Amino acid sequence: MNGFLHDAEKGTVDIIVQSVGRTSILLSQLNVGDCLADLVGPLGQPSHMEGLKKVAIVGGGVGNALAYPLAIGMHKAGIHVDMICGFKTKDIVILEDEFRAGVDRVFMMTDDGTYGEKGFTTDKLKALLDSGEKYDEIVAVGPAIMMKFVCGIAQDYGIPSVASLATYMIDGTGMCGGCRAIIGGEPKFVCVDGPDFDGSLIDWDLLIKRGKTFAEQEAHDREHICKLTGGVRSNA
């Protein structure tokens, strides 16, 4: 679940939900007028923008919703922003118009080639770098495996990288330890210390392993709740 836009005057927050497990499926089935008991956020530390003149932001899947406020905020701060948006297929593309209206350049990628260019976000990033594009920083937002490879490419080209992590969060205060990640050999809590970390310091293998902790439970709950409610309303 990712909040990507807020309006302080109207008192509204726009949220994009991808139906994965029990909770997100139930959220996707809410109707106009339904209520959520509590909504907590934002958590962690603000993203840094000091000293940046040109950045590439790489978003994967629903991670593009998290990338959106960062991209817009950087552009408003006078930073040149190239946005690379990646999706598995055309049916789950989100926020293209919003990105095009708010940043300098947008590159749309789909794994199967049904929309934009065919290929992965890493393919486009490497193509831009090989063509001579220079960036002060590369930011990755999305699935852990994608962020791992994006940050690896940045390191290969000698460019600083930042990964915006989205781990399991339970209490949002650092007490439960569910969002723990190893950064530079030390434990950090994404909800308090993050979500942004130096991509070259993240223990990616452990992060990916921890991200699969509830995969079996999610699959079981998804099947169960779909049987009870008659299916998932939408994919995102």
What are these regions (language model features)?
Residues 102, 181-182, 204, 219:
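Short alpha-helix boundary/capping motifs
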Residues 1-32:
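Ferredoxin-reductase
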Residues 22-170:
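FNR/FR-type flavoprotein reductase catalytic core
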Residues 36, 90-92, 130-136, 161, ...:
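Short secondary-structure transition/capping segments
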